[in-house]
């Protein structure tokens, strides 16, 4: 099968997303935002690391959107655990911190992207699509400052 056919075959199903945030209002907003996209669907939500890991055990998830600050652990620690158990899982870190340091730490933990919560909704969707398609995404304000070895 050539690459173009395989790519279109992979896009026949919606990208299944797990939303992890300890604030219900943020989770619900992300769920609404994601479910408006024709190629994306939220298949599970979690308010903490335990619920997130349980969700991953119970169903197929393609991509996880993880808050960097959870009540029971950091989103970075959760990302490391998820990537260890599910190496093909794509992780996008969502953070209230607009910080180069946190962006670098997120990528080192195994995340494919880092987006600040203050970004416009459209930017969050762009970030989801980019990481889903195998690219790295970092909030615009961080890109210019990101060293080329940020994931090393």
Question: Can you annotate each of these PLM segments?
Answer:
Residues 26, 71, 95:
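The feature encodes the CheY-like receiver
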Residues 54, 76-88:
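Short amphipathic alpha-helix used as the core "switch/output" element in two-component signaling
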């Amino acid at each position: 099968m050539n690459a173009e056919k395989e790519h279109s075959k992979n896009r026949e199903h919606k990208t299944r997303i797990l939303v992890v945030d300890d604030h219900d209002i943020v989770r619900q907003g992300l769920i609404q935002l994601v479910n408006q996209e024709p190629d994306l669907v939220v298949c599970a939500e979690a308010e903490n690391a335990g619920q997130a890991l349980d969700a991953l055990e119970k169903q197929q998830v393609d991509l996880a959107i993880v808050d960097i600050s959870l009540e029971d652990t950091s989103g970075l620690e959760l990302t490391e655990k998820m990537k260890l158990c599910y190496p093909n899982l794509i992780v996008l870190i969502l953070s209230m911190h607009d910080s180069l340091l946190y962006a670098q730490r997120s990528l080192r933990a195994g995340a494919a992207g880092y987006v600040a919560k203050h970004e416009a909704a459209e930017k969050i969707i762009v970030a989801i699509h980019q990481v889903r398609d195998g690219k790295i995404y970092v909030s615009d304000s961080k890109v210019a400052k990101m060293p080329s070895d940020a994931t090393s």
